Amino acid sequence: MNRLQERYEKEVVPAMMEKFGYKNIMQVPKIEKVVINMGVGEAKDNPKVLESAVSDLQIIAGQKPVLTRAKKSVANFKIRENMALGCKVTLRKTNMYEFVDKLVSIALPRVRDFRGVSAKAFDGRGNYSLGIKEQLIFPEIEYDKVDKVRGMDIIFVTSANTDEEARELLRFLGMPFAQ
């Protein structure tokens, strides 16, 4: 069991039960999965670009990404149906906790001019979305081997019923929300 998972069970669960008045431990919200998506628009012209994005994402997540493909052909964007345009990874259980721990304690503090993540990016159902502009904030990525700076979307899917519960859960887990 890693550091964040232990902290969730020993500190977060009792604190959430007290704050929201849950009667049962199973009512306490938890992170169900974390989805990391990297859209690579240039992949339509140069498929090699997608390979480097896949390798970057694999290094960051510690799990092999799956390619995301275009659902429909769009002439204005010069894309055809089933053309590979990005990659994504769904992390659960141990990998998920390791990634969230790494993101909160190492990667986010390395962002330039970092003042906290937006507290408004909840979807109304207790899920949180976070956009990152460059993959270089992760310690596993070597600056010299990066061909192009790419961003990614990170989605935290929680079992919380409201945004307030999800915000408190992520705050207890160390997510630095902007004031």
Swiss-Prot record:
GO BP: translation
Pfam families the UniProt entry points to: Ribosomal_L5, Ribosomal_L5_C
GO MF assignments: rRNA binding; structural constituent of ribosome; tRNA binding
Keywords (A to Z) from UniProt: Ribonucleoprotein, Ribosomal protein, RNA-binding, rRNA-binding, tRNA-binding
Chain ranges passing through the membrane: none
Listed PROSITE patterns: RIBOSOMAL_L5
One cellular-component annotation, GO: ribonucleoprotein complex
UniProt xrefs under InterPro entries: Ribosomal_uL5, Ribosomal_uL5_bac-type, Ribosomal_uL5_C, Ribosomal_uL5_CS, Ribosomal_uL5_dom_sf, Ribosomal_uL5_N
Database matches in SUPFAM superfamilies: RL5-like
Protein family per UniProt: Belongs to the universal ribosomal protein uL5 family.
Functional note: This is one of the proteins that bind and probably mediate the attachment of the 5S RNA into the large ribosomal subunit, where it forms part of the central protuberance. In the 70S ribosome it contacts protein S13 of the 30S subunit (bridge B1b), connecting the 2 subunits; this bridge is implicated in subunit movement. Contacts the P site tRNA; the 5S rRNA and some of its associated proteins might help stabilize positioning of ribosome-bound tRNAs.
Quaternary structure, from the entry: Part of the 50S ribosomal subunit; part of the 5S rRNA/L5/L18/L25 subcomplex. Contacts the 5S rRNA and the P site tRNA. Forms a bridge to the 30S subunit in the 70S ribosome.
Name by which UniProt lists this protein: Large ribosomal subunit protein uL5
Taxonomic placement: Bacteria, Bacillati, Bacillota, Clostridia, Eubacteriales
Gene expressing this chain: rplE
